[in-house]
Amino acid sequence: MNRGVVIAGSLTGLAILAGWLAARAPATAVSRDPAPSAEDVVKLRTLSMILLSRNDNDPRLDKDFNELSPGAKALFRGMYGKLPPERRNERGTIVYLLGRNLASAEDWAFLASVAGEPPCLSLADCSKDAPTAEGHLGDEVTLAYPSLVALKSAEAALTAGDARIRTKARSVVEAGRTSKMPAVLRLSGRLEAEL
């Protein structure tokens, strides 16, 4: 079966499951994330369709995901966690959208966790080294894409005037300094030097 069809089915299934869970599951005291609203589920479905289309220039990315609610952000973080690690572009897109909507401790913790993720060694299988032909700079950046996007979001926050936001952004940079990915180490090192 075509790998793209399998991935498309998986993303669609995730969006349907999220909608079903949002409609059925009550919010519990243990969950820090609020139950997603119907609007949150629509945003997740829209994101799923954009990711399926593989269109990084879809104008909805710049207009439909501003001011995400806590419920939508929780759904997006859930989708990120369910995507295979090899889906670097899709995962990076989710980090990009969440990085534009930083408000809560969970938002910053998510960015820090992405910045410090284990390395993805190959687009075919993150757990296995790539053949030597794949090891040029472009692939190095692609393999580190979600972490680099997290660091760029932190970089934008570092320019903010609010000391509390800068402190939170520093935690993302510090997480990037623990990475084993050369591109992430370079960017986090540059950001750390600028602090």
Positions of predicted regions on the chain:
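N-terminal leader/linker segments that initiate helical-solenoid repeat arrays
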Residues: 26-62
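Amphipathic alpha-helical scaffolding segments comprising HEAT/armadillo-like alpha-solenoid repeats
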Residues: 31-45, 67-82, 103-126, 163-174
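Hydrophobic membrane-insertion alpha-helices, especially the h-region
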Residues: 5-24
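Internal alpha-helical scaffold/solenoid segments in large eukaryotic proteins
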Residues: 11, 21, 78-83, 87-98, ...
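Short coil turns that connect the paired helices of HEAT/ARM alpha-solenoid repeats
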Residues: 38, 50-53, 81-87, 116-121, ...
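Eukaryotic acidic, Ser/Thr-rich intrinsically disordered low-complexity regions
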Residues: 28-36, 170-195
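Extended amphipathic secondary-structure runs
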Residues: 148-181
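Structural detector for internal amphipathic alpha-helices that build alpha-solenoid repeat scaffolds
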Residues: 49-68, 81-82, 90-102, 129, ...
